[in-house]
Every structure is written in C-alpha cells, then in structure tokens.
C-alpha cells in the first residue's frame, strides 16, 4: 500500500455562497498543500453559473442526488432548517460514495451545516474538520450560546440585554441571530445542534485572519476564553474567496466600468439568495437616483416574504429580460448616463477589484464582505438574515470600514439611502473608510503569503502535517506494524 499524499473528502451544503468557499478551500489544499481533494456537492436545478463554476475548479467533483424533502419541512420553515434536512438526508448517499472509493479519504471536511456527516469520519477511520466559511465571531457565538443557562439566554432574547461573549465585543440584541429569538422553532434547535457539534470534530477551520477579527480570534485561540468551549484546534485560514479572473471574464458591465473614473462607482448586490421587498426595491432605486452617483446594480425580483426565501434555489446566474419592471417607471432611462442595471447576476469578484469601483452596498454575507476587503472597497451595510447583522456590526463599529442602515427591517427611506451613498462616495468619512479597508487588504495579502509564512498558510500547513501523520499511522497499521 503506497500512498504519498493525504486525501480530503469535502461536503458542501447547497447554495453558491456555501459551495464557492468549500471549492476554494479544496483548491488551496490541492495546490499548496499536496492534497488529493474530492468535493461532494448536491445536484441542483440551478443550471448555468453553478455548473460552469464546478466544471472549472480543478478538483474532483462528485455530485450527490439532492434529497426530496417534500413532506419533511413546511414551506414556511427557515432556510437553515431546510438546508439541515437536505444535508441530513444526503448522508446515506455520501456514505455510499465514500465506501466505494479506491483510496479512502484521510480527512472529512464538512461545512457549517454538514455536521450530521461527522459520524462518517469514525465509521471510515478519518480525521474530521468543520469548515466555517463565515467568521470567528459567528463561530464564537455558535459554540458559546448553546452552553448558557436559560436565565442568561433570556436576559439577551427577552430583556434585550447585550450578550457578553468571553474576550469579544458583546452582541447587541438587534444583531443577534434570528434563530435565537424563536426557541420553540426548529431553526433554533438546528443552530444549537450544529454549535454543539463543531467542537466534536478534530479541528475547526474558520475563514478569517488576525487583523480582520483580532478580539474574536484571540479569544478562540485562548484556552481560558472561547478556546475553553471550542476544545479543539481552531485554524484561521482566511481570506478564502473566489480568485479574480478578469482576463477570462466576458461581461458588458466590465466594459462599462472601463469607461468610468477611478473609485467613482457604487456596486449594489444582495448576494445569490438575498431579496428585497417591492417597497425596499423602489426606495433603493429612488435613493440611488437622488444621490447622482455612478452605480452598478445587480437586481433580483422583489419578494414579500422572507428576505432569504430565494437562498436555497438561487443559482447565481441567468438573465430576466423583464427586470426593469421591478424598478420605478423611467428609472433606467433617467440614470442611463451614470448607471448600469444587471439582471440577476454579475461577476462580483471582478467588479469589486476594478479600479472604478469605490463603494459596495451589500447584505454583508461573509463571502461578499471578504471580496470587498480584498478589493479595498468600503461598504454600506444592509444586512438581511443569518449572521449578517453581526457582520455589519463588525464592519461598522469595530473596523470602521462600513456605514450601516439603522434598522433594515424597518421602513427604508430613499433619503437615508441617498445620504449613505453620498457619505461613502463623496465625503471625508468615505475617504477614511477607504484608507482603513486598503490597510486590511494588505493584511489579507500577508495572511495568504506562502513565502512570508502568513497565518492562513501556516494554519493549513498544520492541518496538512496532522493529516500526513494520521495517514502514516494508517499505512503502518495496514502493513501490520
């Protein structure tokens, strides 16, 4: 039995916002750390963008049939509950695929919603890791909150007091995870279940770095603070986001940006699954028009239900010719000299790295946040769901690289949007944020440095050594050593 390199099996939950970070981690393990990587993804009806992305990854992709969850969840269930049911139902198919592999994996890496598959690590004698594609703050809250007494939880969720987290900034009631506010709902049990499962792995990989989250990361690495709850090694491996491929990307928005002045364009996007209501969409359009600033706006159809209702089905691609119908009458023609409206999808990483882009109105999804930081672009924070409120607090209050809507769940006025756009794009506060985010961009490059021994590189080297030692023990045992 001659095996020269470890084999990582990776299991991603559905949604491009989850698939992309898992794939990028796999590519990094393969290219920089000598792993053979197999990524398991769920088949989806989403066609063009995800299929194109998966076909260009350079790692082995194995598609699992997407389970039929009809009758297992209610239509109104939270997206996290739906994802959890899907992932749990997919474990038997994953087990069968791993069992049929000629070279059994050395390690199983699941993402934040894949903890039901951790049992397979023991079954097939693999190391196990949880990959948190979001940040250290989310990880800290996730593992700490389930261990609190009921009275302490109610001080936060009922009395609305800030939640104290060891070594970290307190979490305001307004920024807490929505799931914690509904303890009788399945989504609450899902978050608690996952949070309790993370420390049961052999290690936790988190998509951040020291300068991005100094307090939260220091606490997780300190055995007297959050490290006491984590119990296993925490590996900061960020920033992990899709690399920029401008030379390979053909999209008319990039041609339009080439004609604009430096740092003059505001980019607006709410991710692959975030949607606004019709009223919010209208107010945003009027706010943009009144600001008189250049913009690129990725528009998705409005929804009147959950702001994350499109998440599981979002495919990150395609066009819809009737997109202007969602906007105020005459908006496109009135702003045609300074605006570019894109139906449904645009090459975000390439846009945020473009010299013409000077601001980003974002839902604060972590992948989008990292792409903005890597591009050196300050933000307007409009969080919608999940941990995005905590992300917005980090960006605006701790790092000073974003301005934030006061309460996006309340009515949003066009005048507030206009003021925030002007603040970021034309005023001194925006210039100060731009300087800060460019310093963070430089620290991100240092974290990824191979020659300079950056934190992300060193963390993955530690994981590699652990897997290599484990593989050697397995080989020795198979030889009867």
UniProtKB/Swiss-Prot annotation:
Record: active site: 18 (proton acceptor), 111 (charge relay)
MF (Gene Ontology): coniferyl-alcohol glucosyltransferase activity; hydroxycinnamate 4-beta-glucosyltransferase activity
Keyword Glycosyltransferase: yes
Source organism superkingdom: Eukaryota
Binding-site list for an anthocyanidin: 18, 386
Catalytic activity: (E)-4-coumarate + UDP-alpha-D-glucose = 4-O-(beta-D-glucosyl)-trans-4-coumarate + UDP + H(+); (E)-coniferol + UDP-alpha-D-glucose = 4-O-(beta-D-glucosyl)-(E)-coniferol + UDP + H(+); (E)-sinapyl alcohol + UDP-alpha-D-glucose = 4-O-(beta-D-glucosyl)-trans-4-sinapoyl alcohol + UDP + H(+); (E)-sinapate + UDP-alpha-D-glucose = 4-O-(beta-D-glucosyl)-trans-sinapate + UDP + H(+)
Pfam families (alphabetical): UDPGT
InterPro entries: UDP_glucos_trans, UDP_glycos_trans_CS
Distribution of this protein across tissues and organs: Expressed in seedlings and roots.
Enzyme Commission code: 2.4.1.111, 2.4.1.126
Binding, UDP-alpha-D-glucose: 346, 348, 363, 366, 368, 371, 387-388
Keywords in alphabetical order: Glycosyltransferase, Transferase
One Gene Ontology biological process: lignin metabolic process
Purpose of the protein: Involved in the O-glucosylation of monolignols (alcohol monomers of lignin). Glucosylates coniferyl alcohol to form coniferyl alcohol 4-O-glucoside. Glucosylates sinapyl alcohol to form sinapyl alcohol 4-O-glucoside. Glucosylates coniferyl aldehyde to form coniferyl aldehyde 4-O-glucoside. Glucosylates sinapyl aldehyde to form sinapyl aldehyde 4-O-glucoside. Possesses low activity with sinapate and ferulate as substrates.
Other information: Plants overexpressing UGT72E2 show increased accumulation of monolignol glucosides in roots and appearance of these glucosides in leaves.
Family statement drawn from the similarity comment of this UniProt entry: Belongs to the UDP-glycosyltransferase family.
Protein name from the UniProt record: UDP-glycosyltransferase 72E2
Organism encoding this protein: Arabidopsis thaliana (Mouse-ear cress)
